[in-house]
A protein has these predicted regions:
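A membrane-interface helix-boundary motif in multi-pass transporters
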Residues: 154-180
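Loop-to-transmembrane helix entry
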Residues: 44-60, 136-139, 169-172
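Intracellular juxtamembrane helix-capping segments at the cytosolic ends
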Residues: 115-131
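Helix-to-loop junctions at the C-terminal end of transmembrane segments
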Residues: 64-77, 159-160
């Protein structure tokens, strides 16, 4: 029954953390792509040019999605998620601390690392889910998109402060996506450890 499936999924911590990680990833993606415009505007870049940076970011995500699929032939998905999560976190740190064009370039570069996250988290979360539970399990992973919409308004509120701690508030606001990417990297690392433990036990 659906109730029994829900109980099994709830007890599967690898899966439940996967759903939460997916939620944080989606939140990060929305925040990065939504607020590139405000970040560029703070540097005195007009909105039309700022939109071009957004388009470049999305193009990077698409390009690296294909590259990531190729690289995954040589690296397992857990390692890929960890490495790309760390890469995204480092770029986000650059976007926070570097006030200027360098920060904007870091912000655009985040999209390259986001490219493989959604399908990779999805696949990893379902690794230890029984076949009879996968339909409902997959549905919750897709529904995590809704949860991801909760954080961007908070980032918008931070940006509205204009200046925080002597820095542009738009830079400080990217601490929220930074937290999300750290969670993504940590999930990849934890999943890798679980996978290795299972291989040793077998």
């Amino acid at each position: 029954s659906a109730g029994e499936t829900l109980r099994r999924l709830w007890k599967n911590h690898h899966y439940t953390w996967g759903v939460l990680t997916q939620m944080f990833y989606v939140a990060a993606q929305i925040m990065v792509w939504t607020f590139i415009i405000q970040y560029a505007d703070n540097l005195g870049i007009d909105k039309a040019t700022a939109q071009l940076y957004n388009i470049v970011a999305m193009g990077l995500a698409l390009t690296f999605r294909f590259l990531g699929t190729y690289i995954m032939k040589y690296l397992n998905p857990h390692t890929m998620l960890t490495v790309f999560g760390i890469g995204a976190a480092l770029c986000t740190t650059g976007a926070i601390l570097w006030v200027g064009m360098g920060g904007l370039i870091c912000l655009v570069a985040i999209s390259a690392f986001m490219s493989i996250m959604f399908p990779t988290i999805y696949g990893i979360a379902l690794e230890n889910v029984h076949e009879r539970d996968t339909s409902l399990g997959a549905a919750f992973l897709v529904m995590a998109i809704v949860g991801g919409a909760l954080m961007p308004p908070l980032q918008g509120m931070i940006i509205d402060q204009k200046v925080l701690f002597g820095m542009p508030a738009v830079n400080i606001s990217f601490i929220l996506p930074l937290i999300c990417f750290i969670i993504v990297a940590a999930y990849g690392r934890t999943a890798a450890r679980i996978s290795r433990r299972k291989q040793i036990n077998h």
